[in-house]
Amino acid sequence: MPLNKNTGLSDDEEQYLKNIGFRIQYLRKQRGLSQNELAEKANLSYTTISHIESTAPYGISIIALFKIAKALDVDPYKILMFE
């Protein structure tokens, strides 16, 4: 499978990261939180939240995933798995 020259990721990997960003954005909005509010609750920077949600394939660290899940009061599994 060819890799993107800029990211080093396959199309499937890029799409998975985009889906994670979409899922976090959906859960955040469902709870009525702004990106700034989620960043504060998760003890992360606004830029980190913005990058994750922007669908740009920056990736997400395991620690950031757990902090965001805790701030959103969901199991990290709910962010990683799509129905």
Each model region followed by its residue ranges:
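Recognition helix of helix-turn-helix/homeodomain-like DNA-binding domains
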Residues: 43-59
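A short, Lys/Arg-rich alpha-helix, primarily the initiator
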Residues: 3-30
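Short, basic-rich loop-to-helix N-cap that marks the start of a DNA-contacting helix
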Residues: 56-70
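Conserved hydrophobic/aromatic packing and binding residues within compact polymer-binding modules
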Residues: 24, 38-39, 49-52, 79
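Short C-terminal boundary/hinge segments that cap the last helix of small helical domains
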Residues: 73-83
